[in-house]
Amino acid sequence: MDPKCSLILLSGGKGERFGANQPKQYLPFQGEPLILHALKTALHIPEITEVIVVCDVSYRHIFEGFPVKFAESGKRRQDSVFSGLQHVSNPWVLIHDGVRPFIYPDEVTELIAVAQQTGAATLVSNVPYTIKQRHPVKTLDRDALSIVHTPQCVKTEILSAGLEFASREGITLVDDTQAAELLDIPVSLVSSKHPQIKITYPEDLTIAHALL
């Protein structure tokens, strides 16, 4: 099966929880905008043959000199993914958050291989703490739960159909592989072997620097 994938790099978030005067994916990290750390890694992964950056037009200059396509960001995550999907030319697509500076080539290779067995796969890690449901209050079995990360990999036609279904039914998705779930397509879970960090709060940048 052809492992070639397109990467949709989501960069439309405003970073309101971070409190900075610019979106957190563009904050300085190792002397350049944070998002470029993930992009540079992705461009050296053989399975990724095209990258679509979904961002506001005013930030496109940040990606000058990189071989990427652009798509307009939408109101919701799923709208941005659908926008990027219109520029995808491969049968498989990876979706990655621009506020996650680390992409690991070995995990991308495994993720794609696993996704091709079922149609969709996502990186996950174990839940290390106790989780309680709010209403009614009860303790959940953390062994039955996983923390979801990106990238996620979905067959392009499945992602497109799932997003269209969600739009018709007025469903707001919380992650990208949920589009496959809506079509009753099983999603495979790939356990991450590396530290995962999403830049949400200022202290997350300190952690990211420590992981280099």
UniProtKB/Swiss-Prot annotation:
Record's keyword terms, sorted: Isoprene biosynthesis, Nucleotidyltransferase, Transferase
Site (Positions MEP for the nucleophilic attack): R142, K198
UniProt enzyme class: transferase
Enzyme Commission code(s) on record: 2.7.7.60
Database matches in Pfam families: IspD
Source taxon at top rank: Bacteria
Catalytic reaction list: 2-C-methyl-D-erythritol 4-phosphate + CTP + H(+) = 4-CDP-2-C-methyl-D-erythritol + diphosphate
InterPro entries on file: IspD (IPR001228), IspD/TarI (IPR034683), IspD/TarI_cytidylyltransf_bact (IPR050088), ISPD_synthase_CS (IPR018294), Nucleotide-diphossugar_trans (IPR029044)
Site residues (Transition state stabilizer), renumbered to this chain: R17, K24
Gene Ontology biological process terms, A to Z: isopentenyl diphosphate biosynthetic process, methylerythritol 4-phosphate pathway
Family (UniProt): Belongs to the IspD/TarI cytidylyltransferase family. IspD subfamily.
UniProt function note: Catalyzes the formation of 4-diphosphocytidyl-2-C-methyl-D-erythritol from CTP and 2-C-methyl-D-erythritol 4-phosphate (MEP).
Protein name, entry field: 2-C-methyl-D-erythritol 4-phosphate cytidylyltransferase
Gene designation: ispD
